[in-house]
Amino acid sequence: MESALLLPSLLLVAAYPRGGSPQQEWMQSPPAPSVTSAPFWVRLNPELEAVPPGGSAWLNCSHNCPLPVHSSLRTQLRQGKIVNGSGWVSYQLLDVRAWNSKVRCVVTCAGETREATARITAYKRPRSVILEPPVLVGHKYTLRCYVTHVFPVGFLVVSLRRGGRVIYHESLERFTGSDLANVTLTYVMRAGLNDLWQPLTCHARLNLDGLVVRSSSAPVMLTVLALSPASIALASTSIATLVGILLAVGAVYVRKYLAVQT
């Protein structure tokens, strides 16, 4: 009988060793909470920076790695000062002359490497866009548009508009110079009666892979219509005929008037 009573006690001790109870054992060994770590990221700002040729720029590379990291900026541009803080590094880039430069920030955190990219564009808006008044040469008009101090010329499109409608445009992509340049566009046109007092304008547009820079000239107008020799001869004949008709009609009325008076 005693052995029968001891068996449950032994089983209880085996289930809860060290004299603990079910409630005490749960309090001593709570379940471990699940922890989800944030994904490792790297950012480079601004992602697109525009500067004048020969200018400088600052790019900021930031990350969320809590550990000491190794970071570097990879670019063909000349680097200047470096300023860093907790989770970020700022890099200075000097003498930017290429119209389009790619920059990469590479960060390694706990053996994992990530990178972010940015682009620096060097450009110069035209200092001026000037359309000269039309010049009559022979029986056609010559238009000249001057675009001054612009870069890069290879991404420039110059167009002429009459009354808001494009009558001519030219892309200068064949030019590959790396300096500021002046551009002159010459266009010869005929004009009709409908072109009189229509505003003529010249427009310069830089297309820089997503960045569009526009400039335009003040309007000029056609105030005199150029006529060909045939047109002049026809007009002279028409005028002479009209004058003759008017003189004949006038003579008839004069004779009738004199007859009535007598």
UniProtKB/Swiss-Prot annotation:
One GO CC annotation: plasma membrane
GO biological process, one term: cell-cell adhesion
InterPro entries, alphabetized: ICAM_N, ICAM_VCAM, ICAM_VCAM_N, Ig-like_dom_sf, Ig-like_fold
Disulfide bonds: C61-C105, C61-C109, C65-C109, C145-C202
Extracellular-side segments: 23-231
Ig-like C2-type domain boundaries: 54-116, 138-209
Molecular function per GO: integrin binding
Transmembrane regions listed in the UniProt entry: 232-252
Segments on the Cytoplasmic face: 253-262
Keywords: Cell adhesion, Cell membrane, Disulfide bond, Glycoprotein, Immunoglobulin domain, Membrane, Repeat, Secreted, Signal, Transmembrane, Transmembrane helix
Signal peptide residue numbers: 1-22
Its biological purpose: Adhesion molecule that binds to leukocyte adhesion LFA-1 protein LFA-1 (integrin alpha-L/beta-2). ICAM4 is also a ligand for alpha-4/beta-1 and alpha-V integrins. Isoform 2 may modulate binding of membrane-associated ICAM4.
Family designation: Belongs to the immunoglobulin superfamily. ICAM family.
Protein name (record): Intercellular adhesion molecule 4
Gene that produces this protein: Icam4
